[in-house]
């Protein structure tokens, strides 16, 4: 597998709709950087967040997930409590080609503040807004800035198309819009 460069990412965004909306340059003045980089794409976080809370004494069970585990916030700056967690989604909608796997890595500025972003791989054929998981590993409240860069996607091109894509197997997170909570089917 090869890591794909800016020229390839731009071409796939423009001809295939791989990233929408697509920012064809790196924007970084006064904000967490976002847009096209040399070998990746820095995606923005939307302004809708779900922040873990224990107000309702909920238990986190991935097989029977309670919406009472979160409080919803729509804001330009999300404050994640100490040692807590929040969900959000990307501003960008992704459509991954059948011969590509996308891997997400965190932003160094957030990581240096104890904020970890986790996203599982974007499988070949997958489409949707990416649900982002933010962990505040510090004993202090931490800020996430909406509509600014949150993570970077790196695109790996396979030698050929896969036999069965995420779309072919009717993956449970296909075509997600906004924040999608855990699903066990």
UniProtKB/Swiss-Prot annotation:
It catalyses: dCTP + H2O + H(+) = dUTP + NH4(+). The keyword Repeat does not apply. One of its GO terms (biological process) is dUMP biosynthetic process. It is an enzyme of class 3 (hydrolase). Pfam families: DCD. Pathway: Pyrimidine metabolism; dUMP biosynthesis; dUMP from dCTP (dUTP route): step 1/2. Its EC number is 3.5.4.13. The keyword Hydrolase applies. DCTP binds at residues 107-112, 131-133, 152, 166, 176. One of its GO terms (molecular function) is nucleotide binding. Keywords: Hydrolase, Nucleotide metabolism, Nucleotide-binding. InterPro entries: dCTP_deaminase (IPR011962), dUTPase-like_sf (IPR036157), dUTPase_trimeric (IPR033704). Transmembrane segments: none annotated. The active site is at 133 (proton donor/acceptor). Homotrimer. NCBIfam families: dCTP_deam. Catalyzes the deamination of dCTP to dUTP. Belongs to the dCTP deaminase family. This is dCTP deaminase. It comes from Wolbachia sp. subsp. Brugia malayi (strain TRS).
């Amino acid at each position: 597998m090869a890591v794909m460069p800016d020229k390839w990412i731009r071409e796939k965004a423009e001809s295939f709709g791989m990233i929408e909306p697509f920012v064809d340059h790196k924007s970084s003045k006064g904000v967490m950087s976002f847009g096209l980089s040399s070998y990746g794409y820095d995606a923005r976080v939307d302004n809708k967040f779900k922040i873990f809370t224990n107000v309702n004494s909920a238990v986190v069970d991935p097989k029977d997930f309670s919406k009472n585990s979160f409080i919803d916030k729509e804001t330009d700056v999300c404050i994640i409590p100490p040692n807590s967690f929040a969900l959000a989604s990307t501003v960008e909608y992704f459509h991954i080609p059948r011969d590509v796997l996308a891997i997400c890595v965190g932003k160094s500025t957030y990581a240096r503040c104890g904020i970890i972003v986790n996203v599982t791989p974007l499988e070949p054929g997958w489409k949707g807004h990416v649900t982002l998981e933010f962990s505040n590993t510090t004993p202090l409240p931490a800020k996430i800035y909406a509509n600014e860069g949150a993570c970077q996607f790196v695109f790996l091109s396979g030698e050929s198309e896969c036999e069965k894509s995420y779309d072919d197997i009717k993956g449970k997170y296909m075509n997600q819009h906004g924040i999608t909570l855990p699903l066990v089917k």
